[in-house]
Amino acid sequence: SRERFYAHIDDYKGKIILRPQELSNAPEVIRRLSIIAMNTAIEVDLAGNVNSTHIGEGAVMNGIGGSGDYARNSGIAIFSTASTAKDGAISCIVPHVAHVDHTEHDTEIIVTEQGLADLRGLTAYERAHVLIENCAHPKFRPGLREYVEQAYAQSKAKHGIIRL
């Protein structure tokens, strides 16, 4: 918690360095240090695209900050989210995100309380299945599987997912 962090702030002396955003978010610094970038997501789609800023039909939840710089230039880009929202009524692993802040090319690992999906080197079809099996809430897995199989069956190119 924030209170616990500040209560022990002296313990972190020499372990945490705070720098201006111009330095800490600089792509060259991030790249050279091979930083592990950990960011939050509101929702993740079956291709691996991440929405970090918008809810529903466009309501802005927060700003993107430096997460784009970190995701694109880090050694490993990790995004975490809950598997559901609204007390389990809504899946945070969805066929298509409402808004794309980070493309599938910038995301490598997705984490929910259900598990971890390592998307590196996978095809779109494989990414979808890894996200469903490892990150989606069990209640939503059948519908997500059905979506992927229908999209794949209708696709002329059997390497990707199409919109229905």
Where are these regions (language model features)?
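Conserved phosphate- and dinucleotide-binding cores of soluble alpha/beta proteins
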Residues: S1-L164
